[in-house]
Amino acid sequence: QYLALWDSGIKDAWFPGPIFEMTSQWTLLRRSPEWIDQEFNHFTNYISGTHRSLGHNDNAYNNPYMFEYWANKHGVEIMSRIFQETTLDDKTESGQLNFIKTYKRLTHINQEQLNEEMYDAASRFITWDLPRIEMAYAARGANVHTCQLVQLGVTYRISPERCPSNYGYNGIKLTVPEAGTTVKVNFRGIINSSEYNIHKPNNAQWRYGFLAVLKDGSRVYGEPSKEDIGSASLQVPENTEHLWLVVAATPKEIYDTGADNQWPYQFTLDNTEPDGDKCRVIKK
């Protein structure tokens, strides 16, 4: 962490928040892909906090996984470059340096592409579909995401306690219908509610879609949607063992990494329902 601080591209300025701890945990994950077994408590804390914003202080010791996703996509050098090639242009509106803005600039992607990556990563994290850690995480880490919903008639709403912040996500486990059945989510983003901490509602955006995990461990990713009021569907493959709805908060603007603003949503389902084992449903 000390070396990373002095490796910064800007002297006397550095990233706020837990990026140093997150990077330390990522280097441990690179050395020991079976990190889940060495510090399982950090993994369970991560699973209970996937809704938190990327870079949230509460995930400092729990979340090296986006860095692993980036390293898999661009090579391990991307992490050192984020520290070495930071510029003052990588500040958010509040004036904080932001490692997500640095990553976006270094990889030459726009906000739309960044948001697509965030959803892709969230979907892969359900089964740890990343080459270096996939096998090590299969036994204890795959298909264990949890969630909490509030049920209002036939409508399910994400609970305030598990509502995703910036680039946070929810893995919602569903019951598996007969093969060949088309499951559908009818989604509606919420931008006006006193139950949630909503900031700059005009920046609201989500991505959501299905993931089917087959008995042999292979995966079928459904086509995600990003409409504030829209739908996504998937025809359930043969030999499906697990079925997931993945919802990621992908706002149109990059916020401070520790921001707690929330992006709530609600939905109805066709031909499936939340699995009561991994997804707690509170009826009202």
Give, region by region, the residue ranges found by the protein language model.
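Residue-level recognition of short, structured coil/turn motifs
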Residues: 7-11, 32-33, 75, 104, ...
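Long, well-structured alpha-helical subdomains associated
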Residues: 36-86
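Structured segments of extracytoplasmic/periplasmic soluble domains
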Residues: 2-5, 27-30, 34, 69-77, ...
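Zinc-dependent metallopeptidase catalytic helix centered on the HExxH motif
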Residues: 1-37, 44, 48
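Beta/coil-rich, acidic/histidine-enriched accessory regions frequently appended to metallopeptidases
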Residues: 90-284
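Short consensus segments that form the blades of beta-propeller domains
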Residues: 13-15, 57-58, 198-202
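Stable alpha-helical elements in mature extracytoplasmic
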Residues: 19-23, 27, 63-66, 75-82, ...
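Short catalytic/ligand-binding loop motif for oxyanion handling, primarily in non-cytosolic enzymes
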Residues: 10-12, 89-92
